[in-house]
A protein has these predicted regions:
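Long, contiguous all-alpha helical interaction modules
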Residues: 1-130, 134-141, 282-464
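Long amphipathic alpha-helical coiled-coil/heptad-repeat bundle
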Residues: 146, 150-184, 189-203
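Domain-exit/linker segments immediately C-terminal to small folded modules
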Residues: 178-331
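Generic hydrophobic/packing signal
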Residues: 140-144, 149, 173, 224, ...
């Protein structure tokens, strides 16, 4: 919440009452620190402003310290590697230019509309660098503003680019919160009443892009642990650094791995805001400490398995498990998928089996079921049954029974699964001790059937 105050020489208080104001606080702190501008943190001052909101920290500052000139200079520095004109100026520091450098300068000019407009009739030839340097310096603010506001991973990803550094807007500038003024507005509010539609917007929301992590990722994140300004700034700094140092993973997997290793700065329930370049809105998910602890318990477990399902979807076991862990969803469907993958052509059956067995153990621990002894029994029964079928010269029935059990489980037909397991027990002349627990409540104890089916594998009787 933004509040006008009369507090010594300061006139504005910004408190992180929701994620938008929290992100604005983080962005503003970076801005003030960059220029060495004085501001106060609410919890650090003994005498509080008269009209502050109790229960929230905040920052106290002078509104006059926020200027467009400084804002653009800050944006140029913060997102320096995306500022095309800076790349050009760096090249132009040379005294002599080779053909590749000349071509690169002209290609960089053509890559940005604002630069094409400024150099419409001029082409860099290696002898006219002074013209290029002076033109860029004379139009620097315009260049920065256009590059920044139109960058798909910069301002445009977070806000309506037409509203950059504007005030008194009727709707919020943020993506997903913004409304086209030229459209009919009668259907915006409750019962189609535009008067019931509420939106707020402040200039400080222009600092939100600086609060989100790693602009080189297609999906960026902001951790809204708004217990204090200190926790907001320090957590997001550490979070971004860990994301940067996590390599060779897609954005979601990076997030999961960072959360796994976040115990030094996240030790409580926390809200995380994400913004993807592929979506015109923000997404929020709530990470509960209980689930975060479960996620951290997965650290060190080998869940590497990737399989192409179709041109648009790759099954990533690690990602599937991590997302279900955070969302408090069990692994039943993932286990069934892995059991089915076992029968695919060219499947590395032993590898798939080991991953499936691990998933079953994780699933049982998440459920809190005290059936680990029965799980071990089911695995042992599966192995001994396979061995017995081989000895009976009936090894062809191993995969046959395995497929039948998996098909019944996929269809949630537990009566059919019981029949198949009983039939197999009679065929090999063995008693399956785990079966009685499965019989009592098949749906609750389906992991026993998962474990038994996974252990049915064509192994040599010598491999006992």
């Amino acid at each position: 919440m933004k509040t006008k105050i009369d507090y010594f020489d300061y006139d504005t208080l910004l408190q992180p009452t929701d994620w938008r104001f929290a992100a604005a606080v983080v962005g503003l702190c970076k801005y003030f620190d960059y220029f060495g501008i004085d501001y106060k943190v609410l919890c650090d001052v003994e005498e509080k402003p008269d009209n502050y909101i109790h229960g929230f920290d905040g920052i106290i500052y002078k509104s006059e310290d926020i200027t467009e000139e400084k804002y653009l200079e800050f944006a140029e520095n913060y997102f320096e590697k995306y500022m095309t004109h800076k790349n050009i100026l760096n090249i132009l520091e040379s005294q002599e230019f080779i053909e590749e450098q000349i071509k690169l300068v002209n290609d960089l000019v053509k890559s940005k509309t604002v630069l094409k407009g400024l150099f419409d009739k001029i082409k860099f030839d290696g002898t006219n660098k002074d013209v290029f340097i002076s033109t860029i310096e004379e139009n620097r603010a315009e260049i920065i503003k256009n590059i920044f506001k139109n960058g798909n991973n910069l301002y445009k990803n977070y806000c309506n680019e037409r509203l950059i550094f504007t005030e008194d807007n009727s709707t919020c500038r943020l993506r997903g919160y913004n409304v086209d003024k030229d459209r009919k507005t009668s259907n915006l509010g409750f019962c189609f009443s535009k008067e019931s539609f509420e939106s707020n917007d402040i200039l400080e929301f222009d600092f939100i892009p600086f609060a989100f992590s790693n602009s080189d990722m297609r999906e960026t994140y902001f951790v809204n642990n708004n217990f204090s300004v200190k926790s907001l700034t320090q957590t997001n700094y550490a979070f971004s650094n860990q994301l940067s140092s996590t390599e060779n993973k897609d954005d979601k997997n990076k997030l999961m791995l960072v959360l796994q290793n976040s115990k030094d700065y996240i030790s409580y329930d926390v809200e995380i805001i994400s913004k993807s370049q592929d979506k015109a809105y923000y997404e929020t998910f709530f990470v509960r400490l209980e689930r975060l602890k479960k996620l951290r318990e997965l650290s060190g477990k080998s869940l590497n398995f990737v399989k192409k399902i179709n041109d648009d979807y790759w099954f990533n076991l690690e990602k599937e498990v991590y997302m279900r862990c955070l969302n408090n969803v069990l692994l039943d469907d993932v286990i069934l998928m892995m059991l089915k993958f076992y029968f695919d052509d060219n499947a590395v059956k032993g590898y798939i089996k080991s991953r499936t067995d691990m998933l079953i153990d994780i699933n049982v621990s998440w459920k809190g079921n005290e059936i680990m002894d029965e799980i071990k029994s089911a695995k042992s029964c599966g192995f001994l049954t396979s061995k017995k079928l081989i000895e009976m010269k009936s090894s062809n029935k191993i995969n046959s029974y395995k497929q039948k059990i998996i098909s019944a489980l996929c269809a949630h037909d537990y009566d059919r699964a019981k029949e198949i397991i009983l039939s197999l027990s009679a065929y090999v002349g063995m008693e399956f001790s785990f079966f009685y627990t499965f019989l009592e409540n098949a749906e609750e104890n389906k992991d026993l059937a998962f474990a038994f089916a996974s252990a049915l594998i064509e192994v040599s009787s010598k491999n006992n």
